[in-house]
């Protein structure tokens, strides 16, 4: 498949042919219709993102259609339009991520590609009032905003922010 691939910090990202990401029993394969770009991809390309292992397929935000679902996943997802939640292994404490937390594109393959295998639990219905490009722009920005409000600003249920 084709994907936005970064060989090293000295080479510009380029569209290349890469192997399909391996899907496990709890995964779903999503055919991407749109992927969002974040400043994170620029930092990665400049070698300024800590913990990044190169070479890598870039991208954390995306929306598409579920192609297949692994044997342990919800088969009703097949054919559904979805948004990818980019967080992997947040843990049980909503205030901060676990030590094993990661994002799509770090350490595994990113989603600026024709398709990606992700945990089926990381898929959410695409809002019908959004097209794929609009939906793809939401996940990581939304997670960043939510975390800023809840963990940094300390906003709690029942409180409001203006």
Where are these regions (language model features)?
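Exposed loop/turn and edge beta-strand positions of beta-sandwich/beta-sheet ligand-binding modules
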Residues: 14, 26, 60, 97, ...
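Glycine-rich beta-strand-centered segment in the early N-terminal region that forms part
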Residues: 21-35, 48-91, 107-110, 117, ...
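NAD(P)H dinucleotide-binding glycine-rich loop of Rossmann-like/cofactor-binding domains
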Residues: 86-162
């Amino acid at each position: 498949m084709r994907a936005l691939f970064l060989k090293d910090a000295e080479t510009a990202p380029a569209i290349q042919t890469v192997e399909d990401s391996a899907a496990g029993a709890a995964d779903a394969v999503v055919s991407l219709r749109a992927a969002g770009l974040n400043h994170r991809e620029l930092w990665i390309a400049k070698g300024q993102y800590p913990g990044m292992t190169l070479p890598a397929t870039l991208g954390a935000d995306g929306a598409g259609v579920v192609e297949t679902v692994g044997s342990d996943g919800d088969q009703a997802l097949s054919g559904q339009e979805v948004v990818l939640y980019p967080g992997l292994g947040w843990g049980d404490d909503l205030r901060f991520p676990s030590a094993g937390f990661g994002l799509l594109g770090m350490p595994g393959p990113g989603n600026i590609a024709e398709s990606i295998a992700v945990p089926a639990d990381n898929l959410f219905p695409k809002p019908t009032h959004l097209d794929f490009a609009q939906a793809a722009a939401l996940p990581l920005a939304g997670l960043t905003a939510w975390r800023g409000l809840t963990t940094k600003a300390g906003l709690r249920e029942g409180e409001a922010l203006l």
